[in-house]
């Protein structure tokens, strides 16, 4: 019963994040330090990936097996502090990630629009990848400027040996031509990948993780991200 209540709580938090995602100004909340996170719009579809049936992809997760990790493991020992959460693409997913990290009591800084110079001050960066045209508009950022920012962050991570976790939590609505530009940047520098499996129905994320030889955790739903996040960042 407690587990069921916890899942319901996470779902409610994520739902609220969709309608009131992101904030501006500096604000400390829970275990996180809130910094100049852009106001996020509701999730908007950038084009859905092909279905699993047509792509030949076989889903690993199910209602009975909600979290599946492949290509080895990524453990708490792999995390170095301080930790930053940021977005590339400015989707509402970064606010849902923020809500989940608060739920597990993680110690981190949240800044949805962090610059490459900001990123250089951290040892671990969790990137919520996938684009939202509404989110970009709300943040007053053009697609071109956001791509330049994303590439600069990726280069900084490489140059400074920063551990990168790519978190793709928006499912099929964070796929398509625009979103995949940001997804590819995150995958290119990721040491670990978390993906809601609906967004991997063409095998994009599993293929990239296999090619790079990095662990990937497939999630049946966004609420299931609480499991790996607790294992990695829980007190």
Map each language-model feature to its residues.
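Bacterial N-terminal signal peptides that target proteins for export
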Residues: 1-8
């Amino acid at each position: 019963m407690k587990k069921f209540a916890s899942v319901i709580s996470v779902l409610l938090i994520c739902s609220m994040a969709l309608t009131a995602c992101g904030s501006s100004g500096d604000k400390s909340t829970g275990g996180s330090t809130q910094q100049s996170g852009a106001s996020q719009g509701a999730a908007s579809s950038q084009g859905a990936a092909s279905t699993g049936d047509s792509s030949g992809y076989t889903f690993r997760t199910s209602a009975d097996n909600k979290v599946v990790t492949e290509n080895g493991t990524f453990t708490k020992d792999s995390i170095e502090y301080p930790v930053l959460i940021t977005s590339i693409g400015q989707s509402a997913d970064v606010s849902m990630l923020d809500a989940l990290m608060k739920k597990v009591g993680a110690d981190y800084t949240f800044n949805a629009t962090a610059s490459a110079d900001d990123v250089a001050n951290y040892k671990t960066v969790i990137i919520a990848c996938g684009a939202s045209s509404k989110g970009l508009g709300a943040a007053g950022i053009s697609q071109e400027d956001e791509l330049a920012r994303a590439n600069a962050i990726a280069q900084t991570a490489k140059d400074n040996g920063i551990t990168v976790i790519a978190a793709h939590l928006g499912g099929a609505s964070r796929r398509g031509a625009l979103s995949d530009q940001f997804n590819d940047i995150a995958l290119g520098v990721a040491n670990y990948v978390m993906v809601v499996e609906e967004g991997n129905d063409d095998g994009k994320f599993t293929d990239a993780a296999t090619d790079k030889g990095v662990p990937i955790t497939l999630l049946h739903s966004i609420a299931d991200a609480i499991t790996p996040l607790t294992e990695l960042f829980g007190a």
